[in-house]
Design a protein with these regions (language model features):
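Active-site-proximal cap/loop segments of hydrolase catalytic domains
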Residues: 526-734
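Secondary-structure transition/capping motifs at alpha-helix termini
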Residues: 155-157, 196-197, 211, 298-301, ...
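N-terminal chloroplast transit peptides
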Residues: 1-47
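C-terminal substrate/ligand-recognition segments
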Residues: 332, 369-372, 376-380, 465-471, ...
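Glycine-rich His-Gly loop
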Residues: 330, 426, 494-499, 576, ...
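Cap/lid segment of the alpha/beta-hydrolase catalytic domain
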Residues: 169-178, 440-441, 448-571, 575-576, ...
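Structured, non-catalytic alpha/beta "coupling" segments that mediate domain-domain communication
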Residues: 131, 136-146, 325-326, 336, ...
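Beta-propeller folds
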Residues: 2-14, 58-391, 395, 504, ...
Length: 734
C-alpha cells in the first residue's frame, strides 16, 4: 500500500499540523541509502525528514534538452512578509542573534567533538546498500546523487546504466528528488523536486527515449500519478493547502483541466493508485473524516465516482482486488481501524463487510496489499507483530517480531504479484536489519546483506506509568547494561502526544552515542499520540489535552521512583507539536527536570488558533478545538498553552532550535516565547535573592537555512551536536 497508506494509518489527515507543524508524509524516497539521514535527538513522531545527497559513485553529465517554450521555475522562494510588526520582529531577531553569538562559544569545542563521534558512528552503522528501485517490466529505475538512472538488468554497473535525469542540470542545485512515477508504457517519467528551504515541490515530466526531453514543468505539486500511458493526475499545493486535482494529457492535443475541488478548508486532498493500478483514488481527508473518489484507470477521462460520502468521525482508505474494494476504516464499534470489503459496483458503507478487526489496544502501524495476501504490521504492548491474511485460504497467521524492534520501514513493492514482502526493523539504538516474509514458505527470513555490528551493551525495558485518572501509559527505556548507580546517570525523556502520531523510534547514531556514554533514554507514549490505537489519540486531543500532560508527569515521576536518574540529571526533548506538552510541563512541574531541548516547537497554541487567516488554523480545530466559537475551549487551551502560562519561578534551562524559513511555525511566536520565559526566570531570581541562586540558560539557536522538516545532513548534524553539547553542560556538570 506504499507511502500513502502509511501516512493514512499514522494519522490520515495530510492537512493536519503534523502536516502543518510536522510534515510527516511518508514518501517513497528514491535516493541513495548512502545519503546521510537527518539527525534528531528530538524524536518528533514518524518523521522522514529529507536531506541532501552526498557524492555518489555515478556522476551526472548533460544529456537532455528542454522542449521549446518549457520554463524551469526559479526555486529561490521569497519568504512571505511577517504579519507581526516588522520592526518588532527585527528587534527580537537581532537581540536573539546577538545573545547566541555571545554564548555559543561555550559549546563550540564540545559540539565539535560530539559531531566527530556521530560521524564515526554513522560510518560504522551505515552501509553502501543499493538504492531503492522501481522495476517496470525488464527495466530498473533508481536514483543516486540527484540523478535518475535506467538499467535493463538487475546487475547495475556503469556499463549498462543510462542517465535519464539530473536535478543539477535542470537548475535545481539545492533540491532533492522526492518522488518518481513512470508511465505504464515507460514513455514518460514524472519526478518531483523539493528544496530544503521550501514546502512546495516542482514536478518535472520528461519524455523518455534515446534523448530524454523535458516535456512539462508543473510548480507547486503535492502528489501525482500516471492514470494511463499519457494521462497524469496531480494535486496542487498552495499556502500549505492542497484542495485541487488536475488532469494533464500528453497526447497530440495536450490540455490540462480541473477534475476535483475540495470546498471545505478542513480537508486536504491527496491522490494515489491502488496497488493493482485499477483505480486512481482521490482522497479528501480531515483529521477525523474521509471521502474517497475513484477514477477508473481504463477510462481516465470519465468523471470520478464517489465511494462513500463523508460521514463525521469515519476515516477510510481504499485498495482494490478482484473487483472488490478493500477498505481500511474506523467505521463501526470499536472506532479502531479494521479491514472491510465491498463490491466496486455497490461501495456504500451499508455494503461493507468485515474482513479483519484488531484486538483491543492494538495499533495498526501499516498495511500492504498483494494479489493473494494482505500483511498487517501491528503493535501491542510495545511489541511488533505481522499478521498475514490469506485471501485464498481465508486464514490469518500471526508472527511476533524480534523483541528489540521498536519500529519498521516497509520497502516498496511495485509488483503486487510478488511472493515476498521486504521490510526493515530498527530501534533508536539498533541499526536497521532487513527481513523478508515469504508467502510461499510462510516464514520470516533475516536478510544478511551485510553484517551489522551487534549492539550488546544496551538493555530495553518497557514500563507502565499510572496517570492521574488511573490510565496506564507505556514507557520504553534504554540504558547501558554496564551502567551502575542509574539514579546518578543523565536521563533524556522524549515526548510528542499529538495528531495520533507515534514517537519516532527509528535508529539514530546520536542515541547510541548517549547510551555508550552511560545516558538513559526514555520514550513516553502519552495520550494524544497513536501508540495504542485511534482511541489513544482521541483521549488526548481537544478537551482532553491535559490528559497528555498528566501522562507525561506520571511517566517522569515513575522513572525517578524506579531509580532511573533524578530531577537534577533529567532533560526533556520534544519537537514541533510535542513542544505543547513539554512546554506545559515546564510551567506546571519545572522541578521534575533540569533542562529542556525543543526543535521548531509549537508553543503558542491559543494565539495561533485565534488567527483563522493563517493557512492551517481551521484544519487544526479538530486537534485543538475552536477558541473563537467556544469560550470554554478558549479557557481550556489557555490553561495549558506554554506561552500563556509562563510565570516567575525556577525554570529549567532551555535550548530551542528554530528556522527562519519555517512556514508552519512562524519564528515570531518562538521569539516572543523565549523573551517572556527569560524575563520570568530572571524576575524569579531577582525576587528570591538567595545565595547561589541558579539562573537557567534560555537559548535560542536560529537557523537561516532549512525549514520545518528539511535540513541538509551537515546542518542537521551541527544542530544535534550543539543540542547535545548543551545537554552535557547542563546535566553532566551538575
Amino acid at each position: 500500500m506504499c507511502w500513502t497508506a502509511k501516512s493514512f494509518i499514522r494519522g490520515l489527515s495530510y492537512s493536519v499540523k503534523y502536516c502543518s507543524k510536522d510534515n510527516h508524509l511518508q514518501k517513497i524516497h528514491l535516493y541513495s541509502k548512502l545519503k546521510p539521514k537527518k539527525c534528531h535527538i528530538l524524536d518528533w513522531s514518524g518523521s522522514t525528514c529529507n536531506s541532501t545527497v552526498p557524492p555518489g559513485s555515478i556522476l551526472p553529465w548533460r544529456f537532455f534538452s528542454c522542449k521549446e517554450g518549457t520554463e524551469i521555475p526559479c526555486k529561490r522562494k521569497k519568504i512571505a512578509s511577517i504579519t507581526t510588526p516588522e520592526l518588532l520582529y527585527k528587534d527580537l531577531l537581532k537581540s536573539e542573534q546577538k545573545n547566541w553569538n555571545e554564548i555559543s562559544g561555550r559549546y563550540k569545542a564540545m559540539a565539535k567533538r560530539i559531531k566527530k563521534k556521530i560521524e564515526e558512528l554513522h560510518k560504522k552503522y551505515t552501509f553502501s546498500s543499493e538504492s531503492p528501485r522501481i522495476k517496470v517490466g525488464e527495466s530498473v529505475y533508481f536514483e543516486e546523487n540527484g540523478c535518475i538512472f535506467l538499467s535493463k538488468t538487475d546487475d547495475v554497473d556503469e556499463g549498462n546504466v543510462r542517465i535519464l535525469f539530473s536535478a543539477e542540470d535542470l537548475g535545481f542545485d539545492d533540491a532533492f528528488i522526492q518522488r518518481i512515477r513512470i508511465s505504464p508504457d515507460q514513455r514518460y517519467m514524472a519526478t518531483s523536486l523539493k528544496s530544503e528551504n521550501s514546502e512546495e515541490a516542482t514536478c518535472v515530466v520528461m519524455k523518455l527515449g534515446g534523448f530524454p526531453v523535458v516535456e512539462k514543468v508543473i510548480p507547486n505539486v503535492f502528489s501525482f500519478e500516471w492514470v494511463s500511458n499519457d494521462v497524469l493526475y496531480y494535486t496542487s499545493q498552495k499556502n500549505l493547502k492542497c484542495q485541487d486535482v488536475f488532469m494533464t494529457t500528453f497526447t497530440k492535443q495536450k490540455h490540462t483541466e480541473l477534475v476535483y475541488t475540495e470546498q471545505d478548508a478542513r480537508f486536504f486532498v491527496d491522490i494515489y493508485c491502488t496497488k493493482d493500478r485499477r483505480f486512481l483514488t482521490i482522497n479528501s481527508n480531515s483529521k477525523t473524516t474521509s471521502e474517497v473518489w475513484l477514477v477508473d484507470c481504463r477510462h481516465p477521462f470519465k468523471s470520478p465516482v464517489l465511494v462513500q460520502a463523508r460521514t463525521k468521525g469515519v476515516i477510510y482508505h481504499i485498495e482494490h482486488r478482484n473487483d472488490e474494494l478493500y477498505i481500511l476504516t474506523t467505521y463501526g464499534e470499536p472506532a479502531e481501524y479494521k479491514l472491510m470489503k465491498a463490491p466496486v459496483s455497490s461501495s456504500g458503507m451499508e455494503n461493507w463487510q468485515l474482513v479483519y478487526a484488531l484486538e483491543e489496544k492494538t495499533k495498526l502501524v501499516d498495511l500492504e496489499m498483494f494479489s493473494d495476501h494482505c500483511i498487517l504490521f501491528l503493535q501491542n504492548a510495545g511489541h511488533l507483530y505481522l499478521n498475514v491474511i490469506s485471501f485464498v485460504s481465508h486464514s490469518v497467521q500471526s508472527i511476533k517480531l524480534p523483541a528489540w524492534a521498536c519500529a519498521f520501514e516497509l520497502e516498496s513493492h511495485p509488483e503486487h504479484t510478488t511472493s515476498t514482502c521486504y521490510f526493515q526493523l530498527t530501534s533508536p539504538v539498533h541499526p536497521p536489519k532487513r527481513f523478508a516474509y515469504s508467502f510461499k514458505e510462510n516464514n520470516l527470513i533475516e536478510q544478511a546483506v551485510q553484517e551489522v555490528p551487534i549492539i550488546t551493551n544496551c538493555h530495553t525495558t518497557r514500563l507502565l506509568a499510572k496517570s492521574k485518572d488511573e490510565t496506564l501509559v507505556p514507557i520504553t527505556v534504554f540504558h547501558n547494561t554496564n551502567s551502575k548507580e542509574l539514579h546518578r546517570k543523565p536521563l533524556l525523556v522524549h515526548v510528542y502526544g499529538a495528531y495520533g502520531m507515534d514517537l519516532n523510534m527509528s535508529f539514530k547514531e546520536e542515541k547510541l552515542l548517549l547510551i555508550e556514554e552511560g545516558w538513559i533514554l526514555a520514550y513516553c507514549h502519552v495520550r494524544g499520540g497513536g501508540e495504542l490505537g485511534h482511541s489513544w489519540h482521541k483521549d488526548g486531543c481537544q478537551h482532553n489535552k491535559l490528559k497528555g500532560l498528566d501522562d507525561l508527569k506520571a511517566c517522569i515521576m515513575l522513572l525517578h521512583e524506579l531509580g532511573f536518574s533524578q530531577p537534577k540529571y533529567t532533560a526533556l526533548a520534544a519537537a514541533s507539536a510535542g513542544g505543547v506538552l513539554a512546554g506545559a510541563l515546564c510551567n506546571s512541574n519545572p522541578e521534575l527536570i533540569r533542562a529542556m531541548v525543543l526543535q521548531a516547537p509549537f508553543i503558542d497554541v491559543l494565539n495561533t488558533m485565534m488567527k483563522t487567516h493563517l493557512p492551517l488554523t481551521i484544519e487544526e480545530q479538530e486537534e485543538w478545538g475552536n477558541p473563537l466559537a467556544d469560550e470554554k475551549c478558549m479557557k481550556y487551551i489557555k490553561s495549558y498553552c506554554p506561552y500563556h502560562n509562563i510565570k516567575p519561578q525556577c525554570y529549567p534551562s532551555v535550548f530551542i532550535t528554530a528556522y527562519e524559513n519555517d512556514q508552519r511555525i512562524p519564528l515570531t511566536g518562538v521569539l516572543r516565547y523565549v523573551q517572556k520565559l527569560r524575563k520570568a526566570a530572571l524576575d524569579h531570581a531577582g525576587r528570591t535573592k538567595k545565595k547561589g541562586n541558579w539562573i537557567p540558560n534560555i537559548i535560542l539557536d536560529i537557523q537561516a537555512n532549512g525549514s520545518h522538516c528539511d535540513s541538509s545532513w551537515e546542518d542537521s548534524l551541527s544542530e544535534v551536536a550543539r543540542q547535545l553539547a548543551f545537554l552535557k553542560k547542563e546535566l553532566e556538570d551538575v
